Amino acid sequence: MLDSKLLRSNLQDVADRLASRGFALDVARIEALEEQRKTVQTRTEALQAERNARSKSIGQAKQRGEDIAPLMADVERMGTELSDGKVELEKIQSELDSILLGIPNLPHESVPIGEDEDGNVEVRRWGTPTAFDFEIKDHVALGELTGGLDFETAAKMSGARFALLRGPIARMHRALAQFMINLHTAEHGYEEAYTPYLVQAPALMGTSQLPKFEEDLFKISRDGEADLYLIPTAEVSLTNIVSGEILDAKQLPLKFVAHSPCFRSEAGASGRDTRGMIRQHQFDKVEMVQVVEPSTSMEALEGLTANAERVLQLLELPYRVLALCTGDMGFSAVKTYDLEVWVPSQDKYREISSCSNCGDFQARRMQARFRNPETGKPELVHTLNGSGLAVGRTLVAVLENYQQADGSIRVPEVLKPYMAGVEVIR
């Protein structure tokens, strides 16, 4: 979340910057609450000082043999008023905190200004889409032809937006995840982690999925115990490794990577991508998270994005990189690059990775800090996250870009060591 001090001291400037994201900050309400808070706090502090003085005078009056009953009554009355003032302050602060939790991050000055995805700016492209000399099939048809993709059986078990993978296609799905993890750990310096798939609300609060995006989550209610949520991304569990920690500066940067299933209700996706594996309730993803010093986070974003790009380059899949505009960025991001891979059957690029610098937005919620070696004082870290990559969508891209005229699929060179001798899926 944003720094409350920044909000109080630069309220209109913050509102103007948020407006570029299409977010209307209720300046009048915040100003009114701040005025109430100051009034109650000033009154409470004055009352506390007066009560302290009266309490002191009770002892003095007692020594002089005076009647202390009136003073005792005053002190008791003031105690009640102080309790009432504390309750009032807590109520005001609770509303301010609620407003603060609903405010998105401030965009970096380098982020393009725009209202929606039409305002995104293409940064670069890599590779050239194949010019097929036969009628291409989409991944659903290819999967059904080879017997490796079964949506009907999955729907019978679980309903819409689920897939059953079998045989060589299931192996390729696993191979992709193994290849990505091996690349990021061996060449990009990430530490592999295996994390819980179920987390409590504070973990999701820390990474900003809660309270704003609860409808996108799958929740498990338990009698007498804290509710649990299925993770929508391993970003949640990886980033929360540093929740509540004060790190030594020498430990930074921390770079974590995990392969996990992800679970999303897709509450706002009705009617979109209903065919195939593009948008699922359950999908696998390899997630990268970095925890860095504030001065290095923008440079780290470039490196994180390059790490995700390297997966696509080694798979020889054409892609492009977009700098997301202010109106299309995620809630917690300062700046985001999206990677979009070429999907031949759709004749367009589709998102396969989103790489974001969240600045200190998540760290402030989690109280994730490092000790500044120059001042000796704890300061908030910066956190970054990115898909490296979404495994299901990468499988879609491989199936379609490596298809042959007879409906078979060539195995990319970098995946062959993981495929037990299979070079063509038929």
UniProtKB/Swiss-Prot annotation:
Its EC number is 6.1.1.11. It comes from Pseudomonas fluorescens (strain SBW25). GO terms for cellular component: cytoplasm. Pathway: Aminoacyl-tRNA biosynthesis; selenocysteinyl-tRNA(Sec) biosynthesis; L-seryl-tRNA(Sec) from L-serine and tRNA(Sec): step 1/1. One of its GO terms (biological process) is seryl-tRNA aminoacylation. It is an enzyme of class 6 (ligase). PROSITE patterns: AA_TRNA_LIGASE_II (PS50862). This is Serine--tRNA ligase. The keyword Secreted does not apply. InterPro entries: aa-tRNA-synt_IIb, aa-tRNA-synth_II, aa-tRNA-synth_II/BPL/LPL, Ser-tRNA-ligase_type_1, Ser-tRNA-synth_1_N, SerRS_1_N_sf, SerRS_core, tRNA-bd_arm. Gene3D superfamilies: Bira Bifunctional Protein, Domain 2, Serine-tRNA synthetase, tRNA binding domain. Pfam families: Seryl_tRNA_N (PF02403), tRNA-synt_2b (PF00587). The lineage of its organism: Bacteria, Pseudomonadati, Pseudomonadota, Gammaproteobacteria, Pseudomonadales. It comes from the Bacteria. Catalyzes the attachment of serine to tRNA(Ser). Is also able to aminoacylate tRNA(Sec) with serine, to form the misacylated tRNA L-seryl-tRNA(Sec), which will be further converted into selenocysteinyl-tRNA(Sec).
